Amino acid sequence: MQPLHTLRAGVIGTGFIGPVHIEALKRLGVQVTAICGSTKNARATAERWGIPEVFGDYDYRAMLASPNVDVAHITSPNKVHVEQSLAALAAGKHVVCEKPLGMTAKETAKVVAAARKKGSPVFAVNYMCRFFPAVLQMRAMVQRGDLGRIIHVQGHFFQDWLLHATDYNWRLLASEGGKLRAVGGIGTHWIDAVSFILGARAESVFAHLETFHKTRHRPRGERQTFAKVDPRTMLPYKCDTEDFGSVLLRFGKAQHGFASGVHANASISQVAAGWKCSLALGIYGTKGSVRWDLQQPDEILVGRRDEPNQTLQRGTAGFSEDVAGFTDYPGGHPEGFPDSHKMHCRAVYQHIASGRKSPALFATAGDGHHEVKLCEAVLKSSRARQWVNV
């Protein structure tokens, strides 16, 4: 296998998530050789992280033409993901694209077609929740049949960073982030994690969406995600994306015999006061259940009807041996959000370095395309008040 430190990455985007990718790559020893964004932000990011090549004025095509970049990380706003993904594939670069893959299924289908061409580079979509050891453990338990036949799944993804009408981010605008904001932005992480655990995709949905702040306020200029702004300097605008979503899902046939035809329900909110980033899910089967919450990332609760419930911790004998390869620290040393990104990047880069011989546990272009199709079905269902096939 080619050593990971010989691979070179270029990152497009300098907002909140771009530096998360850079940090993950640095921890793996991957060379980050190029950064692309606005000239000011790209230079500042390069100086902070010691990145040698800077491509300002959002000139991503120049970065993709660089012989010093093997893998392109696309961490730019949603509306340009498809354009940049297609350009990266055409330039012969492997791609790690932030979710969502694109704004519409019609355009993401083009990425799938390009990524599936013979000899095309590796393409991954960053649904990194797959790489929490707890999620991998839940997947192993389901696939072994430890929980029996899976009956249903329930859970939520709650945040509060857009609780106030004066909270602002470009994702609030359908023209920038897409028509489905809460479900599309964070809910798809929940849905992808469940799909990964079950080994099955959602085939139909019934959804209710609600926008509580019909009028919001935005700053006069640009600002970074989570940055604070004086409300007195803000301007009102009509918000056209949802704050909350409740989604019922029916999953199709699983890759194994324990999780076909599963029903699920999820509540998604970005206005849940007090919850900063709570992704919780429970898998319920005929023999037992297992529950997990991102805010306690190293623990899962196993439930039985006729036996005592158990709390299993990462780094102990309760977790499967094959999960150990996705953890770097001993039990009692929590691994969280940054570590899931690191493990996702490790899986992608090992797949590249091995000539595609290592397992591709990461989400592919096809997976990203399916999530965009699902988001379109959620929108259609909420408007029609009926079940819609994905």
Language-model segments: what does each one mean?
Residues 29, 92, 119-120, 145, ...:
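Glycine-centered short loops/turns at secondary-structure junctions
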Residues 121, 129-239, 300, 385:
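Predominantly a Rossmann-like dinucleotide-binding segment in NAD(P)-dependent oxidoreductases
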Residues 56, 97, 103, 123-125, ...:
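Hydrophobic residues in well-ordered beta-strands that form the structural core
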Residues 1-50:
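N-terminal Rossmann-like dinucleotide-binding module
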Residues 51-114:
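Beta-loop-alpha module in the N-terminal Rossmann-like domain of NAD(P)-dependent dehydrogenases
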Residues 188, 267-276:
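Glycine-rich phosphate/pyrophosphate-binding beta-alpha loops
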Residues 214-240, 246-258, 281-282, 286-362, ...:
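C-terminal glycine/acidic-rich active-site capping loop/insertion
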